[in-house]
UniProtKB/Swiss-Prot annotation:
Function description: Scaffold protein that may play a role in cell adhesion, cell spreading and in the reorganization of the actin cytoskeleton. Plays a role in the regulation of cell proliferation. May act as a tumor suppressor.
This protein's encoding gene: TES
Recorded GO MF terms: zinc ion binding
Protein name, per record: Testin
SUPFAM superfamilies attached to this UniProt entry: Glucocorticoid receptor-like (DNA-binding domain) (SSF57716)
Lineage of producing organism: Eukaryota, Metazoa, Chordata, Craniata, Vertebrata
Length: 421
C-alpha cells in the first residue's frame, strides 16, 4: 500500500466508545464523544481512558501491532478474517482450594492479565507481590488501573500513522522508520523467573549496589556461603533491596540478566507507574514506558498528544505544538499572534477566558479582563480601580489603604463595618 493510500485511510475511530460515561466527571459528562483531533472527550475534556469504554479487542489489536515484526511474535495471533495481529494476553483463573466440604462453593479469581509462565504458583506469587489496588482482577480497581495504563503508556498514535491526524506522506514514512527503530533497539517484555533458575544457565554477573558489575565473586567463595547468605546476593535494580529466597523476580533481556527487579519495582523511570503487562523500553540503563520513551526521542504536541515528525513546530509555555494545533482549548481557534491565558496548563483565547474562566469583580459584578490589574483576597477579586475597590459602606477608595474584609465586602474602618452589620 503506497503512502497516499495510507494517508487517506487515517481515522481516529470517532464511533468507538461513543456515549460511554465518564468515571471522573460522573453525571456532569453527557457521555464520551471524541474530539476531532484531540484525544479527549468533547463534552468533559477528559481522556478516553477516564471513560468506561469497552476496549478489550481494540487494546489487544494495538498491543498485537506493537509486537508485529519483533521477536515477540509468540505473544500475537493473526485473525484469519483480516490478518490483524491480536495480542494473546495470558488470562489466568485461580481456584481457591476451599471446596473440601459439601455445600462450599469454589472461589475463583480471574486476572485479566498474568505473566505467561508455565508455573501457575509462580504467577500467583507475582500477583501477590503487586499492590492490591494494582492487581488486574476482573471487575476490580486493579483491572481499571491496567486498562488506564494501557491507554496512557502505549498510545496507539505512537506506533500507527493511521491513528494520527493528517500526517503528510513524508511524516508517515518518518514515523514508520521511527517505530521500526524502537522495536529493534528498545522494546522488550519482562520475564518472570526465580533468581536461582538463572544460575542454572551458567555464571551471571550479579548487580550489587555500589559494587563493580564487571567482576564476579570467586565460585569457591560463593559455594562457601550459607543458604541464608545466598538469598541476599540478589538485589533489586530499582530499590536496591535484597531479593527474598523463593520470590519471583523480573528480568529484562535488553538490560542484561545481571539485573533484576521486584514485581512492584518494575516501573517506568519517568512516571513511576507499573510497566503495564511488563512491556518496557530500555534506554541509557533505564526502564521507560512506551509514552515516555517516545518523549525522550521526539517532541510531543501538547494539543493532539501525537509525536511531532514535522520540521516546523512551535514552543510555548515549555510545551511543544504542531503549528495547526496551538489552539484555544475551549473553542479551537488558532492562537498564533493572539492574546491567550493559560488555564490548568491549557491555552485559552481571551474571549473564552472572559466568558468561561474569568473571576467576577465584587464591585461591578463584571468579569475581570486578564490584562487588567486586580485586587484579590482569599476567593474574592476586584478591579484595581477607583470605581470598584471601595469601602462597602462609605465608598471610600481603598487602593493602597488598609481594609477589613468580611464575606466578600471590604470596609475602611470598624465604624463602617458596624454600620453594615
Amino acid at each position: 500500500m503506497d503512502l497516499e493510500n495510507k494517508v487517506k485511510k487515517m481515522g481516529l475511530g470517532h464511533e468507538q466508545g461513543f456515549g460511554a460515561p465518564c468515571l471522573k466527571c460522573k453525571e456532569k459528562c453527557e457521555g464520551f464523544e471524541l474530539h476531532f483531533w484531540r484525544k479527549i472527550c468533547r463534552n468533559c475534556k477528559c481522556g478516553q481512558e477516564e471513560h468506561d469504554v469497552l476496549l478489550s479487542n481494540e487494546e489487544d489489536r494495538k498491543v498485537g501491532k506493537l509486537f508485529e515484526d519483533t521477536k515477540y511474535t509468540t505473544l500475537i495471533a493473526k485473525l484469519k478474517s483480516d490478518g490483524i495481529p491480536m495480542y494473546k494476553r495470558n488470562v489466568m483463573i485461580l481456584t481457591n482450594p476451599v471446596a473440601a466440604k459439601k455445600n462450599v462453593s469454589i472461589n475463583t479469581v480471574t486476572y485479566e492479565w498474568a505473566p505467561p509462565v508455565h508455573n501457575q504458583a509462580l504467577a500467583r506469587q507475582y500477583m501477590q507481590m503487586l499492590p492490591k489496588e494494582k492487581q488486574p482482577v476482573a471487575g476490580s480497581e486493579g483491572a481499571q488501573y491496567r486498562k488506564k495504563q494501557l491507554a496512557k503508556q502505549l498510545p496507539a498514535h505512537d506506533q500507527d500513522p493511521s491513528k494520527c491526524h493528517e500526517l503528510s506522506p513524508r511524516e508517515v514514512k518518518e514515523m514508520e522508520q521511527f517505530v521500526k527503530k524502537y522495536k529493534s533497539e528498545a522494546l522488550g517484555v519482562g520475564d518472570v523467573k526465580l533468581p536461582c533458575e538463572m544460575d542454572a544457565q551458567g555464571p551471571k554477573q550479579m548487580y550489587i549496589p555500589g559494587g563493580d558489575r564487571s567482576t564476579l565473586p570467586a565460585m569457591g567463595a560463593m559455594e562457601d556461603k550459607s543458604a541464608e547468605h545466598k538469598s541476599s546476593q540478589y538485589f533489586c535494580y530499582c530499590c536496591k533491596l535484597s531479593m527474598k529466597e523463593g520470590d519471583p523476580a523480573i528480568y529484562a533481556e535488553r538490560a542484561g540478566y545481571d539485573k533484576l527487579w521486584h514485581p512492584a519495582c518494575f516501573l517506568c523511570s519517568i512516571c513511576h507507574e507499573l510497566l503495564v503487562d511488563m512491556i518496557y523500553f530500555w534506554k541509557n540503563e533505564k526502564l521507560y514506558c512506551g509514552r515516555h520513551y517516545c518523549d525522550s526521542e521526539k517532541p510531543r504536541c501538547a494539543g493532539c498528544d501525537e509525536l511531532i515528525f514535522s520540521n516546523e513546530y512551535t514552543q510555548a509555555e515549555n510545551q511543544n505544538w504542531h503549528l495547526k494545533h496551538f489552539c484555544c482549548f475551549d473553542c479551537d481557534s488558532i492562537l498564533a499572534g493572539e492574546i491567550y491565558v493559560m488555564v490548568n496548563d491549557k491555552p485559552v483565547c481571551k474571549p473564552c477566558y472572559v466568558k468561561n474562566h474569568a473571576v467576577v469583580c465584587q464591585g461591578c459584578h463584571n468579569a475581570i479582563d486578564p490584562e487588567v490589574q486586580r485586587v484579590t483576597y482569599n476567593n474574592f477579586s476586584w478591579h484595581a480601580s477607583t470605581e470598584c475597590f471601595l469601602c462597602s459602606c462609605c465608598s471610600k477608595c481603598l487602593i493602597g489603604q488598609k481594609f477589613m474584609p468580611v464575606e466578600g465586602m471590604v470596609f475602611c474602618s470598624v465604624e463602617c463595618k458596624k454600620m453594615m452589620s
